[in-house]
């Protein structure tokens, strides 16, 4: 591949060439399309589900598609994309396949005739987005020398913000241009449909731009780069034999986790508990069985190199900083998932005074939520330009805790602003939190991890993004049903009460930051 200069040689090490700005833009532009897909999903799926007959209590369960597919697809795609090579290279085949599937899912989603079709399409959409997105993070490491990687990730952040803003305002803009935001019962409004159509086309073209303008290094080229370039073919990426837990560790914890999951599920059954709790119980049982299966693999060969043993082994031997940061990330994403599920019904109730998903007022609220998310993403994108400099002055740990508290204040602000324009103000705090969550935890983590384990630990760190979403999806509905008549009326209704749960979760995350040890603040 031709960079802005050819490879340079220092001693026995051949270094990657630096790329020029236009090449970095080309390799990052696909993220613009990917974020259009995510933003259309986050801003409109609750609205689509409710239009097709879903009630408030089932929304978290229906939203489980995202975290579950992320938990499954991200490690699989990352693992196999490392081993792929073909005419399009290593990562680009996944960009292409994912973009095609995502575009088809975006075209189908607003035309779903039944709730079960929309729910199934969401599973396909989320899986496809993960196939497309996951290799993009590794793409920066593949293509750029070490000193250009911050620029590469910053460029991705810019395109994340730009794509999210445009997709978020699309339904509002189409309605302003005369495309109706009202439809018959059970039919998705035309302004939402056209947002998905245009968004799907934009996603496909953006990803194709990266696929066809960026040529990857061949395996023999990558093998020439030294360790300082994080040689992806280096065979030292797994955990050391001395660190790998013995078979008895996995069998003991496998039995404990499986038994706890089974006991939890049995308690739900015999107490006639809400069926959504079975999601949590079933997930624990599945994790326990994975531990037991891995116990057999490790017993036969403790040094065996396989996907499951490497992931579970490194999961149990995470560095101390990563363990503490995982707690912060967990509660941060609990709050974010609550925001995505409940913002539309909360805004409809607070500013438009309606809970009727088929009403014109509710559709107006749904359009306005797109504007709110656009403000949030715009603030996050702008904040990303200066957040590194601020962190150097006040300390990364203190800044991230402050940003999370700003996000918590944003959640609380939903209760203090009753007009649609007033509700834009809380999105400033939530935008600061969102920009911080996208950047600072990864900066802290990168400083704490050995380079040879960076990839697998980053993948494991993503578990603490999807696991809280599964927890919210499996428990939030039953919790809100329990509080619907007793507590929720005191706070303006179920969705506004749920928003306060998001504020509390951000506060817990900010408190947990005090236990994270960070060099240079």
PLM region spans:
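C-terminal transmembrane helical hairpin of 12-TM major facilitator-type secondary transporters
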Residues: 397-440
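Hydrophobic core of transmembrane alpha-helices in multi-pass small-molecule transporters
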Residues: 105-109, 113-132, 422-436
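Helix-loop boundary and gating motifs at the non-cytosolic
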Residues: 9-69, 323-328, 332-357
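Loop-to-transmembrane helix entry/capping segments in MFS-fold secondary transporters
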Residues: 56-57, 146-156, 366, 449-461
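Intracellular loop-helix junctions on the cytosolic face of multi-pass helical membrane proteins
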Residues: 1-21, 113-116, 132, 146-331, ...
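Intracellular juxtamembrane helix-capping segments at the cytosolic ends
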Residues: 131-144, 436-450
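C-terminal ends and interior cores of transmembrane alpha-helices
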Residues: 95-114, 405-418
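Helix-to-loop junctions at the C-terminal end of transmembrane segments
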Residues: 72-88, 382-396, 480
């Amino acid at each position: 591949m031709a960079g802005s200069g050819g490879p340079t040689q220092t001693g026995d090490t051949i270094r990657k060439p630096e790329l020029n700005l236009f090449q970095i833009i080309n390799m990052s532009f696909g993220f613009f399309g990917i974020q259009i897909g995510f933003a259309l999903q986050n801003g409109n799926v609750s609205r689509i589900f409710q239009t097709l007959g879903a009630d408030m209590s089932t929304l978290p369960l229906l939203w489980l598609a995202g975290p579950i597919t992320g938990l499954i697809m991200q490690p699989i795609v990352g693992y196999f994309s490392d081993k792929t090579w073909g005419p399009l290279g290593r990562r680009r085949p996944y960009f292409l396949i994912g973009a095609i599937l995502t575009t088809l899912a975006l075209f189908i989603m607003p035309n779903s005739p039944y709730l079960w079709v929309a729910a199934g399409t969401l599973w396909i959409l989320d899986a496809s987005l993960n196939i497309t997105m996951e290799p993009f993070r590794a793409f920066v490491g593949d293509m750029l020398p070490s000193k250009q990687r911050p620029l590469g990730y910053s460029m991705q952040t810019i395109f994340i913000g730009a794509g999210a803003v445009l997709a978020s305002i699309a339904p509002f803009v189409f309605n302003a241009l005369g495309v109706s935001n009202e439809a018959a019962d059970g039919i998705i409004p035309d302004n939402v449909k056209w947002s998905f159509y245009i968004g799907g086309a934009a996603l496909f073209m953006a990803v194709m731009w990266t696929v066809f303008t960026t040529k990857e290094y061949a395996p023999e080229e990558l093998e020439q780069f030294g360790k300082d370039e994080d040689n992806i073919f280096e065979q030292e990426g797994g955990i050391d034999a001395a660190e790998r837990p013995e078979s008895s560790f996995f069998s003991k914890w496998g039995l404990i986790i499986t038994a706890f999951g089974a006991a939890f599920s049995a308690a739900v059954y015999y107490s006639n508990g809400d069926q959504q709790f079975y999601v949590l119980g079933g997930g624990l049982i599945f994790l326990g069985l994975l531990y037991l299966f891995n116990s057999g693999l490790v017993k036969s060969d403790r040094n065996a190199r396989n996907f499951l043993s490497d992931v579970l082994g490194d999961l149990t031997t995470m560095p101390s900083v990563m363990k503490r940061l995982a707690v912060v990330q967990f509660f941060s994403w609990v709050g974010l998932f609550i925001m995505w599920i409940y913002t539309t019904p909360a805004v409809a109730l607070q500013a438009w005074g309606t809970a009727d998903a088929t009403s014109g007022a509710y559709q107006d609220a749904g359009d306005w939520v797109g504007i709110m998310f656009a403000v949030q993403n715009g603030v996050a994108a702008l904040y990303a330009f200066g957040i590194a400099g601020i962190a150097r002055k006040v300390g990364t740990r203190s800044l991230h805790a402050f940003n999370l508290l700003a996000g918590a204040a944003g959640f609380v602000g939903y209760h203090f602003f009753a007009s649609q324009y007033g509700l834009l103000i809380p999105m400033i705090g939530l935008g600061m939190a969102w920009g911080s969550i996208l950047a600072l935890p990864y900066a802290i983590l990168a400083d704490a991890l050995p380079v040879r384990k960076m990839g697998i630990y980053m993948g494991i760190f993503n578990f603490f993004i999807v696991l809280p979403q599964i927890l919210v999806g499996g428990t939030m509905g039953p919790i809100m049903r329990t509080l619907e008549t007793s507590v929720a009326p005191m706070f303006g209704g179920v969705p506004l009460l749920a928003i306060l749960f998001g504020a509390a979760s951000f506060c817990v995350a900010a408190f947990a930051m005090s236990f994270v040890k960070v060099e240079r603040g």
